[in-house]
């Protein structure tokens, strides 16, 4: 994941900052607790494709 991309992309729900989870290959919005998958190097920033991040994962 190109870290320059993280400076431009935002959560499609709240427009907040996304962080990169290297292990799970996801972009995570800590505000909405949503994780967006990265498929073949491309972030899929569609709310229906996101999974909810559990409280335990958010720690």
From Swiss-Prot:
Transmembrane segments: none annotated. It comes from the Bacteria. InterPro entries: Trm112-like. Pfam families: Trm112p. GO terms for cellular component: cytosol. Belongs to the UPF0434 family. This is UPF0434 protein VS_2060. The lineage of its organism: Bacteria, Pseudomonadati, Pseudomonadota, Gammaproteobacteria, Vibrionales.
């Amino acid at each position: 994941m190109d870290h320059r991309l993280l400076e431009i992309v935002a959560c499609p729900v709240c427009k907040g900052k996304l962080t990169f989870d290297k292990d799970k290959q996801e972009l995570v919005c800590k505000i909405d607790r949503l994780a967006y998958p990265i498929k073949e190097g491309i972030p899929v920033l569609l709310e229906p494709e996101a999974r909810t991040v559990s409280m335990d994962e958010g720690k």
